Amino acid sequence: SSLIGLNLDEACNTISKIPVNLKIFNKYTFDNRIVYVLNNKAENATTYNQSLLFVKRNTELKTLIIGWKEISRRYNFDDLSWLYDIEFELLNNNEIDKIVCIGPQAYDIATRLKYANIEEDKIVVIPLIEEATKFIKSKTKGNIYGILNFDMVEPFNNNMKGEKSGN
């Protein structure tokens, strides 16, 4: 019972039946590894920080892939200042096997990870998604977390599932 007359069990049951929006969050398995795909928005550190908190909450060994194709479709310049508002320091722990940086700014992401004191041997730069997913499938450990801008979600999923590839 509550002050406003809601039944807690009923409320929890109703909320648990809300379907997951697969455009924002997706989960499947690959080779006995759970693959989480978290859709983020470039230029928006808040979405990336929420994804990092989700990753941090799960304490198993994991591999991450982080990147995007385009920073902005609105502007003609590539402002990366927002990258330094992302709390990559949350990943500075023993639960990370590898962090694979992809896309045109893969080296910029790797540099930001180094500033977060992530061990350099955990940071891998592979700009092309097809090559990155091959590496993840064969040379990494743990569950897989894709922290990706919306423009990389479909190519990542397709390459992980062995469907039509794309970079």
List where the protein language model places each region.
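ATP-dependent carboxylate-amine ligase
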Residues: 2-7, 13-167
